[in-house]
A protein has these predicted regions:
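Short, charged recognition helix plus adjacent turn
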Residues: 68-93
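Short, structured beta-strand segments at or near domain termini in extracellular proteins/domains
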Residues: 289-305
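Functional-site microenvironments in short loops/helix caps that host divalent-cation chemistry
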Residues: 105-107, 113, 148, 154-289, ...
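Recognition helix of helix-turn-helix/homeodomain-like DNA-binding domains
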Residues: 31-49
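Conserved hydrophobic/aromatic packing and binding residues within compact polymer-binding modules
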Residues: 12, 26-27, 37-40
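DNA major-groove recognition helix of helix-turn-helix/homeodomain DNA-binding modules
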Residues: 49-70
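A short glycine-rich, aromatic-capped structural motif
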Residues: 95-152, 169-173, 195, 245, ...
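A short, Lys/Arg-rich alpha-helix, primarily the initiator
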Residues: 1-19, 55-58
């Protein structure tokens, strides 16, 4: 069976036809303008979309149901887009951040299924911390900057038994200050959710089966935070830990002035509150024993650092 190496307007029209969508519906599905779809289809095989749009189309085909894929192959003479059936590997493209040494994983740019309605959204490539920021990680920041430590640390020092537990009692501003010091950012709500659910839009990081035992939530009766690498069976498609339970995570996304989104649920949360697609927010000054964070970084920025081009 022939492989089409790149999309042209002809394959784009075939995909829209196979999906049985109007130009307006197809444009909304891809996250592009109706005018762009019309332009591609009008020029047929004489136009090739930009690489970012090639990736969007690859993802749209990969996520289509079997009947749509069969119709697409029929409309294109049995051809399929090269790489369209690639399954994203778990925990691939791991690196260590050059400043903090924390392990991060790359999440390639593509569409993912966002929110309770599974709306297709495009997110550019980025890296995200595999683990929550721990007390030991945060202590380096406090020592380097003189930032005020969390209120439960005695004499400015965290309890030794909590070294590898997520830092808590931090406001959004504390989390943002750490991220800036580390040369990172807080993840946006879209970045966080994509890393939790993968491009296929699983309900939970591990899949669609509700399994409270795979995370630290109220039903398990742990009654406190757990070490950041505890729940290996609950990792996301990218190998990221604790995207359900343990602690709520501060995000960069502002919901209203002075309030920021949080995701993931916590050890204090009921399991149904830990679903990654759910919305939650809080005042930036909120500070509690079940709220922490992890960091992210744009792919281009981190790769320049890693390759020594800055």
């Amino acid at each position: 069976m022939a492989n089409v190496q790149v999309w042209t307007g002809a394959e784009i029209k075939a995909l829209r036809t196979a999906m049985r969508l109007s130009i307006r519906e197809f444009a909304a599905h891809l996250g592009v303008s109706e005018r762009m779809i019309s332009k591609w289809e009008a020029k047929g095989s004489d136009i090739t979309p930009l690489p970012v749009n090639q990736a969007i189309l690859d993802t749209a085909l990969r996520m289509s149901d079997p009947d749509t894929k069969a119709r697409f192959k029929g409309l294109t003479g049995g051809a399929e887009i090269s790489g369209a059936e690639t399954i994203e590997p778990i925990g691939s493209s791991q690196v260590r951040h050059p400043m903090t040494g924390s392990p991060m994983v790359k999440v390639d740019g593509s569409i993912y299924q966002a929110g309770p309605s599974n709306t297709p959204l495009w997110v550019p490539s980025y890296y995200i911390d595999i683990y929550l920021v721990s007390n030991a990680d945060y202590a380096q920041f406090v020592a380097a900057t003189g930032h005020e430590p969390p209120q439960h640390w005695e004499n400015g020092t965290f309890p030794k038994e909590l070294a590898n537990h997520p830092v808590v009692w931090v406001t959004w501003k504390d989390a943002a200050a750490y991220a800036k010091w580390a040369g990172k950012t807080l993840p946006t709500a879209q970045q966080w959710e994509k890393a939790a659910r993968g491009t296929r839009g699983a309900t939970y990081p591990w899949g669609d089966q509700p399994t409270p035992a795979k995370c630290n939530v109220r039903e398990n009766g742990v009654g406190a935070t757990t070490v950041v690498d505890c729940y290996q069976s609950g990792t996301s498609p990218y190998g990221v830990y604790d995207m359900c339970g343990n602690v709520w995570e501060w995000l960069d996304t502002q919901s209203t002035p002075g309030r920021r989104e949080l995701k993931g649920g916590a050890w204090t949360s009921q399991f149904d509150r830990a679903v990654p697609s759910q919305f939650n927010d809080a005042n930036e000054t909120m500070c509690d024993d079940d709220t922490g964070f992890r960091c992210a970084a744009p792919a281009e920025d981190l790769e320049r650092l890693l390759h020594g081009t800055e």
